[in-house]
Amino acid sequence: MTMSDDTPNEVNHVDIDFPPKTADDFFRRGLKSAQLGIPDKAAADFEEAAWLAPENHDIQFNLGVAYLSMADFEQAINNFTKAIELKPGVADMYGNRAVAHAAIGEDEQSEVDVAEAVRLGAPPDGLGAVIDYVKEQRK
Protein backbone atom coordinates (compact mmCIF):
# COMPACT_ATOMS: atom_id res chain seq x y z
CA MET A 1 0.00 0.00 0.00
CA THR A 2 1.31 3.44 -0.85
CA MET A 3 0.62 6.64 0.98
CA SER A 4 -0.04 9.95 -0.69
CA ASP A 5 2.41 12.75 -0.02
CA ASP A 6 -0.56 15.10 0.35
CA THR A 7 -1.62 16.02 3.85
CA PRO A 8 -5.39 16.00 4.53
CA ASN A 9 -5.44 19.82 4.45
CA GLU A 10 -3.79 19.88 1.05
CA VAL A 11 -6.27 17.35 -0.28
CA ASN A 12 -9.22 19.41 0.99
CA HIS A 13 -7.69 22.57 -0.42
CA VAL A 14 -7.37 20.95 -3.84
CA ASP A 15 -10.98 19.75 -3.67
CA ILE A 16 -12.22 23.27 -2.96
CA ASP A 17 -10.17 25.11 -5.54
CA PHE A 18 -11.11 23.07 -8.60
CA PRO A 19 -12.48 25.32 -11.33
CA PRO A 20 -16.26 24.92 -11.07
CA LYS A 21 -18.28 24.90 -14.27
CA THR A 22 -21.73 23.61 -13.35
CA ALA A 23 -24.29 24.47 -10.69
CA ASP A 24 -23.44 21.17 -8.99
CA ASP A 25 -19.72 22.04 -8.99
CA PHE A 26 -20.37 25.43 -7.38
CA PHE A 27 -22.84 23.85 -4.93
CA ARG A 28 -20.37 21.16 -3.83
CA ARG A 29 -17.59 23.71 -3.41
CA GLY A 30 -19.97 25.90 -1.41
CA LEU A 31 -20.80 22.97 0.86
CA LYS A 32 -17.07 22.37 1.45
CA SER A 33 -16.58 26.03 2.34
CA ALA A 34 -19.57 25.94 4.68
CA GLN A 35 -18.19 22.83 6.40
CA LEU A 36 -14.87 24.62 6.86
CA GLY A 37 -16.62 27.62 8.43
CA ILE A 38 -16.12 30.03 5.53
CA PRO A 39 -19.70 31.25 5.01
CA ASP A 40 -18.82 34.19 2.75
CA LYS A 41 -17.03 31.90 0.31
CA ALA A 42 -19.87 29.39 0.60
CA ALA A 43 -22.42 32.12 -0.17
CA ALA A 44 -20.44 33.24 -3.22
CA ASP A 45 -20.42 29.70 -4.60
CA PHE A 46 -24.08 29.14 -3.75
CA GLU A 47 -24.92 32.41 -5.55
CA GLU A 48 -23.14 31.13 -8.67
CA ALA A 49 -24.97 27.82 -8.37
CA ALA A 50 -28.30 29.63 -7.94
CA TRP A 51 -27.60 31.69 -11.05
CA LEU A 52 -27.10 28.47 -13.03
CA ALA A 53 -29.94 26.53 -11.37
CA PRO A 54 -32.42 29.03 -9.91
CA GLU A 55 -35.09 26.40 -9.28
CA ASN A 56 -32.94 24.17 -7.05
CA HIS A 57 -34.36 24.24 -3.52
CA ASP A 58 -31.20 22.76 -1.95
CA ILE A 59 -29.10 25.59 -3.34
CA GLN A 60 -31.58 28.22 -2.11
CA PHE A 61 -31.75 26.61 1.34
CA ASN A 62 -27.98 26.42 1.74
CA LEU A 63 -27.63 29.97 0.47
CA GLY A 64 -30.07 30.99 3.20
CA VAL A 65 -28.04 29.13 5.81
CA ALA A 66 -24.85 30.86 4.66
CA TYR A 67 -26.49 34.29 4.91
CA LEU A 68 -28.00 33.38 8.28
CA SER A 69 -24.55 32.47 9.61
CA MET A 70 -23.23 35.84 8.37
CA ALA A 71 -26.11 37.69 10.11
CA ASP A 72 -27.58 38.88 6.80
CA PHE A 73 -31.04 38.00 8.04
CA GLU A 74 -33.12 39.71 5.36
CA GLN A 75 -31.25 37.91 2.59
CA ALA A 76 -31.51 34.64 4.51
CA ILE A 77 -35.28 35.12 4.71
CA ASN A 78 -35.42 35.73 0.96
CA ASN A 79 -33.52 32.53 0.22
CA PHE A 80 -35.49 30.41 2.70
CA THR A 81 -38.72 31.77 1.21
CA LYS A 82 -37.56 30.83 -2.30
CA ALA A 83 -36.59 27.35 -1.06
CA ILE A 84 -40.04 26.93 0.52
CA GLU A 85 -41.73 28.04 -2.70
CA LEU A 86 -39.70 25.46 -4.62
CA LYS A 87 -40.23 22.62 -2.14
CA PRO A 88 -42.90 23.22 0.49
CA GLY A 89 -43.11 20.95 3.49
CA VAL A 90 -39.51 20.88 4.75
CA ALA A 91 -39.29 21.63 8.48
CA ASP A 92 -35.70 22.92 8.37
CA MET A 93 -36.61 25.61 5.86
CA TYR A 94 -39.34 26.99 8.11
CA GLY A 95 -37.22 26.60 11.25
CA ASN A 96 -34.29 28.51 9.81
CA ARG A 97 -36.55 31.22 8.45
CA ALA A 98 -38.12 31.49 11.92
CA VAL A 99 -34.66 32.09 13.38
CA ALA A 100 -33.93 34.82 10.83
CA HIS A 101 -37.28 36.51 11.49
CA ALA A 102 -36.63 36.38 15.25
CA ALA A 103 -33.18 37.91 14.78
CA ILE A 104 -34.65 41.06 13.23
CA GLY A 105 -37.59 41.34 15.62
CA GLU A 106 -40.26 39.95 13.32
CA ASP A 107 -41.69 37.83 16.12
CA GLU A 108 -45.13 37.22 14.58
CA GLN A 109 -43.63 35.85 11.36
CA SER A 110 -41.18 33.82 13.44
CA GLU A 111 -44.01 32.25 15.44
CA VAL A 112 -45.88 31.32 12.25
CA ASP A 113 -42.76 29.62 10.89
CA VAL A 114 -42.05 27.87 14.20
CA ALA A 115 -45.58 26.46 14.23
CA GLU A 116 -45.20 25.19 10.66
CA ALA A 117 -41.75 23.73 11.35
CA VAL A 118 -43.07 21.87 14.40
CA ARG A 119 -46.09 20.65 12.45
CA LEU A 120 -43.66 19.26 9.87
CA GLY A 121 -41.60 17.46 12.50
CA ALA A 122 -39.08 19.91 13.96
CA PRO A 123 -38.42 19.33 17.67
CA PRO A 124 -40.33 22.09 19.47
CA ASP A 125 -37.98 22.29 22.46
CA GLY A 126 -34.85 22.57 20.32
CA LEU A 127 -36.29 25.17 17.97
CA GLY A 128 -37.79 27.08 20.88
CA ALA A 129 -34.41 27.18 22.63
CA VAL A 130 -32.73 28.58 19.50
CA ILE A 131 -35.44 31.21 19.05
CA ASP A 132 -35.19 32.22 22.73
CA TYR A 133 -31.40 32.54 22.42
CA VAL A 134 -31.71 34.69 19.29
CA LYS A 135 -34.25 36.97 20.99
CA GLU A 136 -31.91 37.37 23.99
CA GLN A 137 -29.10 38.43 21.64
CA ARG A 138 -31.31 41.23 20.26
CA LYS A 139 -31.41 42.96 23.66
Regions found by a protein language model. Give the residues of each.
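Alpha-helical tetratricopeptide repeat
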Residues: 1-139
